[in-house]
């Protein structure tokens, strides 16, 4: 049905992710590798009291056609298909992401690159952080050290998740400050 790297974000994990960023209104939000839009749904749940058309402020990217249809069916703008080649036309200040565990480091580094300013909250395979054996992982470790924090969540896709895995997961929160004019 879906590809092997599709692990929808459990609702309780999505809530933890949103708690890292506080208020969501007046934010431009992107969920790359959105799957069926679980993080977008969680954000809209928080925004619903502020906006009548809150689904329009949460944009999604998804590579799988079946999942794209699910996202469109929920009313979210699909602004791209392959996140690793995506360059936004607008500036996002919040990126919520649960990328494929196999190359989550590349996804998070790309998110950092396209983020104008603001926050990224990302789920990664814990080994991506504990075993910095590649240049991407080393760069990511430096960015986290300078701009963020990590919370190890353990096997949060093992119990009540739609798709289960014993992969241990970490939540990374990065904050990029607005660049000062030169």
Identify the meaning behind each predicted range.
Residues 1-182:
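Class I S-adenosyl-L-methionine-dependent methyltransferase catalytic core
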């Amino acid at each position: 049905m879906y590809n092997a790297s599709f692990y929808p974000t459990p609702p309780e994990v999505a809530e933890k992710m949103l708690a890292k960023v506080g208020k969501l209104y007046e934010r431009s939000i992107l969920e790359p590798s959105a799957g069926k839009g679980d993080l977008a749904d969680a954000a809209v749940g928080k925004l619903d009291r502020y906006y009548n058309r809150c689904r329009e402020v949460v944009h999604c990217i998804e590579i799988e056609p079946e999942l794209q249809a699910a996202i469109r069916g929920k009313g979210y703008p699909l602004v791209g298909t392959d996140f690793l080649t995506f360059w936004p036309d607008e500036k996002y200040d919040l990126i919520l992401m649960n990328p494929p565990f196999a190359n989550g480091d590349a996804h998070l580094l790309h998110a950092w690159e396209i983020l104008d300013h603001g926050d990224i909250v990302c789920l990664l395979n814990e080994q991506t952080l504990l075993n910095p054996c590649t240049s991407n992982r080393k760069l990511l470790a430096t960015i986290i050290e300078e701009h963020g924090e990590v919370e190890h969540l353990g096997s949060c896709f093992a119990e009540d998740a739609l798709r289960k895995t014993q992969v241990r997961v970490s939540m990374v929160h990065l904050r990029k400050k607005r660049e000062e004019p030169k």
